[in-house]
Design a protein with these regions (language model features):
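Tryptophan (W) side chains
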Residues: 366-367, 374, 383-386, 393
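C-terminal solvent-exposed extensions
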Residues: 57-60, 125-128, 265-370
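Flexible, polar/acidic helix-loop-strand segments at domain edges
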Residues: 70-75, 174-253, 262
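Amphipathic, coiled-coil-like alpha-helical scaffolding segments used for oligomerization/assembly
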Residues: 138-197, 264-267
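Entry/capping segment at the start of metal-dependent catalytic domains
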Residues: 2-112, 300, 305-314
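Extracytoplasmic/secreted envelope proteins and their assembly/folding machinery
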Residues: 98-100, 134, 146-154, 169-173, ...
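Extracytoplasmic
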Residues: 74-77, 95-101, 110-118, 132, ...
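Second-shell loop/turn segments in exported
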Residues: 88-92, 135-143, 158-163, 218-225, ...
């Protein structure tokens, strides 16, 4: 008898359940991964645009320069950092004088950056003024904004300066607050603004404390030079703390909070490249300052730098930028020469009167002008003699 063929299902109910479960799980995992990736992209996109919007608020298009290829991680650059004590840096606000002026020179070849302080009372020509004008260097920002500040410092020490950032003191406080404060060993003991600082004792400072620490001047035996050193100390410590903070979620909050207190001509793309390509330079730093002497100009107290000191700082910055040394010849070297000729001495140890003489160009301008005119006269005489020897003059 022929046996009937029996139908056997592919598996039991349990087996079928296992089969479906085995094939469904990859889809579930895939969807979860896609959702996670999508959420991450959405999050970082959101943070990116929040950060970009915050940075865009700090951008000053009036002094914009092309930055294509400038920040590739190999090229060196310098930024003029300025600090003011005015309110928020709204575009409609009246500019104040800069209490702090620091050149930040970034050198990827040596994986370091250098901070060089320019004393606020430094005598300098205001480059870009309608007529010849000599003021304290901190007046440049009030008179002609960031461009006059960059041009005046550039001419003072003969280095090219294309970029700047001006920060209100309130902005520094907020930045320090958002990174959780900074730890500093004070360079001297003093009390200021309700805060007590002990020399050499590691002290945790919030925004207000760090600001008080960097502001005090009159109780420092070194005066403004001591204050400049403390300012560089705060900035250096803040930079190191900022790069150690890895939480991207706080970045847009930090930038949003300080956007009304910062102005710069570095666009968002440039800041991105600096943060990415020069991160290794932030771990090592050196510092210096332009040293001057007390002098009275029209009954006002100034700092006047000898030509040798201007040359020293110029050589140092140019070396960090990979540039050849050049002999400084400007208004300040001209004024030094004229004042020394009339009895001024940088070695006197006393506060002396310093006079400003008319200046229209290079150092030794009168001699060069005389030589140029004499050369023209000599050429004319030679030409007339040559013509007189020709037959048609006879």
């Amino acid at each position: 008898m022929e046996k009937k063929r029996q139908y056997h299902p592919k598996g039991t109910r349990v087996q079928n359940h296992k089969y479906r479960k085995h094939h469904i799980w990859p889809w579930i995992v895939g969807l979860v991964v896609l959702a996670a990736v999508g959420a991450a992209i959405a999050y970082f996109t959101s943070v990116y645009f929040k950060t970009k919007n915050a940075v865009d608020k700090t951008y000053d298009p009036h002094t914009a320069v092309k930055t294509t290829g400038e920040f590739n991680g190999k090229k060196r650059f310098v930024v003029l950092l300025m600090g003011t004590d005015t309110g928020a840096l709204d575009r409609t606000e009246k500019r104040g004088r800069t209490d702090t002026m620091i050149l930040a020179v970034v050198n990827p070849a040596k994986k370091r950056y250098t901070l060089i302080s320019i004393p606020r009372d430094t005598m300098a020509q205001m480059i870009g003024a309608d007529s010849f004008q000599t003021e304290k260097i901190n007046a440049a920002y009030e008179l002609g904004g960031a461009k006059m500040s960059m041009d005046s410092v550039s001419k003072l020490i003969n280095v090219p300066i294309k970029y700047y950032a001006v920060v209100n003191m309130g902005g520094i406080m907020k930045m320090i607050r958002y990174v959780g404060g900074i730890n500093i060993r004070p360079t001297l003991s003093f009390e200021y603004g309700g805060y007590i600082f002990k020399k050499g004792k590691l002290t945790h400072m919030g925004g207000a404390g760090a600001l008080a620490y960097s502001r005090m001047r009159y109780d420092d035996p070194r005066g403004d030079y001591g204050r400049q050193e403390r300012q560089r100390q705060v900035i250096t410590t803040l930079i190191k703390k900022a790069i150690s903070v890895s939480s991207l979620s706080n970045l847009d909050s930090i930038l949003t909070s300080v956007s009304s207190n910062v102005r710069t001509n570095l666009p968002f793309s440039a800041l991105q490249q600096i943060a990415t390509n020069y991160r290794g330079c932030a771990k090592t730093s050196t510092s210096d300052y332009l040293h001057g002497y007390n002098a009275m100009i029209d009954d006002a107290a100034y700092q006047v730098q000898p030509t040798s000191e201007l040359q020293r700082i110029s050589n140092k910055v140019r070396a960090e930028l990979g540039l050849e040394k050049e002999t400084i010849s400007n208004n300040e070297t001209y004024q030094n020469k004229r004042n020394i000729a009339h009895g001024f001495s940088f070695k006197s140890g006393k506060t002396q009167d310093y006079h400003i003489y008319d200046y229209t160009g290079d150092d030794d301008n009168w001699w060069r002008l005389f030589m140029r005119r004499w050369s023209v006269i000599s050429l004319v005489i030679f030409w007339l003699r040559w013509l007189s020897e020709k037959s048609f003059w006879k």
